[in-house]
């Protein structure tokens, strides 16, 4: 997973590679420059990585973490497969859900923290 952090007028933004946009959207809407929130998530990941699943419910995006994988999903995303979506809506779906390994997510959060503190 590739990512980049930028800062403009004190506001930090994340961009992630295609397929991981929801992770950047989660960061940009739920975390931003809140280093305490990042440290809390990192601590939960590092202590609970092998013990139990972790769920972080946010206002717009939620994060679901198990031993091997992290899923970031928009709270308004309906995962009903009974109703087919029009072709144009799949693009929005791709920006609303993303998966990555826990190690990649830890690296993303550590990099965000380092960027904020620099």
UniProtKB/Swiss-Prot annotation:
Top-level taxon: Bacteria
Transmembrane domains' residue ranges: none
Pfam short name (any one): UPF0231
Entry similarity comment: Belongs to the UPF0231 family.
HAMAP family xref list: UPF0231 (MF_01053)
Name used for this protein in its record: UPF0231 protein PM0457
Species, as recorded: Pasteurella multocida (strain Pm70)
